[in-house]
Design a protein with these regions (language model features):
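Extracellular S/T/G-rich loop segment that most often corresponds to the catalytic His/Ser-adjacent loop
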Residues: 31, 177-263
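C-terminal subdomain of the subtilisin-like protease fold in secreted/lumenal serine endopeptidases
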Residues: 124-128, 263-303
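Subtilisin-like serine protease catalytic core
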Residues: 15-28, 32-46, 55-106, 122-125, ...
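Substrate-binding/access-modulating region of protease and related hydrolase catalytic domains
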Residues: 97-181, 211-214, 233-245, 249-251
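Protease zymogen maturation seam
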Residues: 1-25, 39, 138, 195, ...
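Anion (oxyanion) recognition and catalysis
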Residues: 21, 150-154, 220
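Short glycine/serine- and small hydrophobic-enriched flexible loop segments
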Residues: 72-76, 113, 190, 255-263, ...
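Solvent-exposed loop/turn segments at secondary-structure junctions
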Residues: 33-35, 50-51, 77, 97-101, ...
Length: 303
């Protein structure tokens, strides 16, 4: 995570003084589930499984646990090396995708309804959705999904969604990242290039505009070769961390930054958060919406 944090201007005074690291901020993660990895221990407020209806918390894919570690991992098993962006935020895990990372719109909608029911009780302020539909989904189903994420937004939640990995052609932002209301995140690599390491096979980050000519993604963050929590760490010969790439990995970088912001300014509305993000991004020569996330500028009172 070192290069990720360097790339997004993470090491500002508020972070170095450990003042605003997501304290008292709840973040819901709609994904493949989550395990109580030591880096997340004690901060998972709840879990529900809308795929297999199991009661015990689990993640049979590893995707959701990796996302959660980027967002809020403490770095306990790495002496802080792989700590997430908001290591004191709390998490609410909704399993809406199966062990292959696939799912039905109904699973996501059920997860959304659950988050809305838990919002006030758990002080959920942010919803991280590292989920995107594959091209060719029925239009009616796309509309249901868009209505679902916009219902979250209208309830006052900050909704952060991945742009999808179907780039680099125009018009490749996945639903529900195409929603005008939500904050949509694309991915850059270590050199700041959109969607990968300068080779065609890594040039994956979804591009706008949407069918309605909306500029997307809204901003970008590092998403290529990201080291975070490994859901299989308990098995023999498995390491506590693993590497993944995608806009799914860039999205929790932004969600974590927003958790830090809300721990400093807890009265901010979701619209105010979005405007602060827009004002604080570092513009780029590439097609990257507002530009690159910059945590120091985001937390600054003067921007």
């Amino acid at each position: 995570m070192k290069w990720v944090k360097n790339a997004v201007g993470y090491w500002c005074e508020d972070i170095l003084d450990r003042k605003y690291l997501g304290q008292k901020i709840g973040v819901s993660v709609l994904d493949t589930g989550m395990i109580p990895h030591p880096d997340l221990a004690g901060r998972i407020m709840g879990f529900d499984d809308f795929v297999n209806r199991r009661k015990r918390i689990y993640d049979d894919s590893g995707h959701g646990t990796h996302v959660a570690g980027i967002l809020a991992g403490s770095g306990k098993l790495s002496n802080g090396v792989y700590a997430g962006i908001a290591p004191e935020a709390s998490l609410l895990a909704a399993k809406v995708l199966d062990d292959s990372g696939n799912g039905m719109v109904e699973y996501v909608m059920a997860g959304i309804r659950w988050v809305l029911a838990e919002q006030k009780k758990k002080n959920i302020r942010i919803v991280n959705i590292s989920v995107g539909t594959q091209p060719g989904l029925d239009k009616a189903e796309e509309e249901r999904l868009l209505e679902g994420v916009e219902e979250l937004w209208d309830a006052g939640l900050v909704v952060v969604v991945s742009a999808g990995n179907y780039g680099p052609e125009p018009g490749t932002v996945a639903v529900p990242g195409s929603s005008r209301k939500v904050i949509t995140v694309g991915a850059v690599d270590i050199a700041g290039r959109t969607g990968g390491a300068g080779r065609e096979k890594w040039d994956y980050s979804g591009r706008g505009p949407t069918e309605d000519c909306i500029m997307k993604p809204d901003l970008v963050a590092p998403g290529t070769f990201i080291t975070s929590c490994n859901a299989d760490y308990r098995y023999r010969f498995r390491k506590p961390y693993t590497v993944k790439s995608g806009t799914s990995m860039a999205t929790p970088v932004v969600s974590g930054a927003i958790a830090c912001l809300l721990s400093k300014y807890p009265d901010m509305s979701n619209v105010e958060v979005k405007l602060k993000l827009r004002a604080s991004c570092i513009p780029s020569e590439q097609t990257q919406g507002w530009g690159m996330l910059h945590v120091g500028r985001l937390l600054s009172a003067g921007i």
